[in-house]
């Protein structure tokens, strides 16, 4: 079995590549810039960029971790082209980092991209495993503005965020035993569903800052982000994260992390304590 990992210079892909290397598992690192690839034992490096011909880099690969590409209007087309390349190269199994509630009607707009990618994988003829990640707990401190506020139209909704470390551990488990996990869709969450008031309080305790959650209407959310200089689609996607929380799409706790890895999922306090 030959395993390949995309995004090996990133957070999830990097953790997966390192864990496999430490176990002595040969891994092919698929990266945009080979010069930035981590130097790990038992690894080889091949250039691969979503949106370009990746079939040569995938030749001989049997099992593949496909870390979703960067957010962009072209992401769905790039994912579909990459899946076509993987099938053409003879890849047998793809483990894909998706998102909770992925599908055409998801409140979180970028989860619709993931739904489209899942559909392409199911139709590809390759075996697949979907890792539907919740919000990364590691990223929640970035939601705090300079004024100490988390702002958005999330109402009283909750999120069951997951640690990046846990996503990587699940991915490693699936890659090492792909047949056991074939055709499975896993919901990867932490052990608790938190409202944004609770998230703000946890970040405040961990950082010593005064952090609060400010409920916004959709219109207020658009106005408060007007100075970001971001494209309209990106602002809409950011705001829809909060809308998905308000609608309850991100608030369901799953035990899949512990069931798959045998270890309890990390909670927000643990993640913040190691940040």
Describe every region a protein language model picked out.
Residues 2-40, 59-62, 68-80, 84-93, ...:
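Oxidoreductase cofactor-interface core, primarily capturing Rossmann-like NAD(P)-dependent enzymes
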Residues 43-62:
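Conserved Rossmann-fold cofactor-binding substructure of NAD(P)-dependent oxidoreductases
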Residues 53, 57, 78, 268-271:
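Hydrophobic alpha-helical packing elements
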Residues 53, 59, 154, 192, ...:
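Compositionally biased, intrinsically disordered low-complexity regions
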Residues 219-275:
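A hydrophobic C-terminal alpha-helical subdomain
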């Amino acid at each position: 079995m030959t395993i390949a990992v995309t995004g090996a210079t990133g957070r999830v892909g990097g953790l997966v590549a390192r864990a496999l290397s430490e176990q002595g598992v040969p891994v092919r690192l698929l990266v945009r810039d080979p010069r930035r690839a981590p130097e790990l034992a038992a690894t080889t490096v091949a250039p691969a960029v979503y949106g370009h011909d990746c079939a040569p880099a995938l030749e001989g690969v049997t099992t593949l971790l496909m870390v979703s590409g960067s957010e962009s209007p072209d992401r769905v087309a790039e994912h579909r082209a990459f899946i076509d390349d993987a099938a053409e190269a003879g890849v047998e199994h793809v483990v894909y980092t998706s998102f909770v509630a992925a599908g055409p009607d998801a409140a979180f707009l970028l989860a619709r991209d993931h739904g489209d990618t899942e559909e392409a994988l199911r139709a590809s003829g390759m075996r697949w495993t979907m890792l539907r990640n919740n919000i990364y707990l590691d990223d929640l401190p970035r939601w705090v503005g300079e004024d100490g506020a988390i702002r958005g139209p999330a109402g009283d909704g909750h999120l069951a965020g997951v640690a990046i470390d846990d996503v990587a551990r699940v991915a490693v488990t699936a890659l090492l035993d792909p047949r056991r996990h074939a055709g499975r869709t896993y919901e990867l969450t932490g052990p608790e569903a938190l409202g944004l008031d609770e998230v703000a309080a946890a970040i405040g305790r961990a950082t010593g800052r005064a952090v609060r959650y400010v409920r916004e209407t959709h219109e207020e959310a658009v106005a408060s982000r007007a100075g970001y200089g971001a494209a309209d689609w990106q602002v809409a996607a950011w705001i829809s994260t909060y809308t998905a929380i308000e609608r309850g799409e991100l608030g369901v706790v799953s035990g899949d992390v512990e069931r798959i890895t045998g270890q309890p999922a990390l909670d927000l306090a643990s993640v913040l304590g190691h940040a």
